[in-house]
Amino acid sequence: MSEVILQLQKRLGETQLDVDLRLPAVGICAIFGRSGAGKTSLINLISGLTTPDVGEIHLAGRTLFSSSQGIQLPIEQRKIGYVFQDARLFPHYTVRGNLNYGVTDADPEYFASVTRLLALEPLLVRYPRDLSGGEKQRVAIGRALLSKPDLLLMDEPLASLDMPRKKEVMPFLENLAQHFRLPILYVSHSMQEILRLADHLVVLEQGKVLSAGPIEQVWSSKAMRPWQSFSEQSTLFSATVAKHHQTYGLTQVRLAEDVWLWVQQVEADVGSSVRMQVRANDVSIALDKPTASSIRNILPARIVAIEHQQPSKKSVSLKLELAPHCYLWAVVTEWAHAELALEVGMPVFAQIKGVSVAQRDVILTN
């Protein structure tokens, strides 16, 4: 499948939405930003609910909109599924009726695949009034998938659900993109949802793209600083489970070539891919490698950037290079920064307790 190509502009009151993006053809791309940043407006332009002032929209090798060529495909020809914040089910139809609404080419095998993935089979004869919020959203997702879209748009689909219902729906969302091999644009203001679900991240601010790319890259960028206080700053890694230490309940993961980390035991097979979060506050710095220490992870690194927090906080953020294109953030006090005379380019050792990275910080991605 081809990339999703978005080059468009739209005046939104006092805000000018101006986007130039190439998004992956498979996986979940989160659209993140403050209220009013243009997140929902962007996906409404893609869907055809609203029209760009100027620009291009290309999906799966097709042109959906082109102001220069005079192309504007109607909504029903765009092959896009849309899941709203509220499920928008028809109350007088059963779940089966809602799922089949608008389906013009019945495919029993595909219907069975969708209902099985979303665990909808026991609900097919029920009506929306008899469903929980999480069940309604699963039906809405199923209805969108049954249109066999080239792209799935999701506008804060979990925002109206309480935490137990969010936990109910989240595993289904994790499986969607890979199972159906399609791109999903997922609007959210929840950092927890993004951490768990997103492969790719776009940060919008007042209609402009501040940062876009793989989530591990964008998560550590300056674009995310307004949402991450120094106490919450962290690094995301795509890692591979290397081995388990059954005696001590630890798992070793591979972050990069010759970069390994011991963490609390991960319930995953050796060779599994995981996404792992390491909090900057859990990383300490030493100038010399300790010879006797309880800390299980002592990694050679090089300081590549230093950021000072506002003076009242007396903290310093250090960007450490562990290997080419493999970086780790650490937060130290101004006192430690001064006493160790830390400078960009200096070789150091990053220390991370094995118990500081727990099961909640590791997400299985395959």
Curated annotation (Swiss-Prot):
Subcellular location: Cell inner membrane
Keyword check for Signal: no
Keyword Cell inner membrane carried by entry: yes
Organism (species): Vibrio cholerae serotype O1 (strain ATCC 39315 / El Tor Inaba N16961)
Every ABC transporter domain range: 1-231
UniProt keyword annotations, A-Z: ATP-binding, Cell inner membrane, Cell membrane, Membrane, Molybdenum, Nucleotide-binding, Translocase, Transport
Role this protein plays: Part of the ABC transporter complex ModABC involved in molybdenum import. Responsible for energy coupling to the transport system.
Disulphide bond pairs: none
Gene3D superfamilies: 2.40.50.100, P-loop containing nucleotide triphosphate hydrolases
SUPFAM superfamilies per record: MOP-like, P-loop containing nucleoside triphosphate hydrolases
Membrane topology note: Peripheral membrane protein
Protein's name in the database: Molybdenum import ATP-binding protein ModC
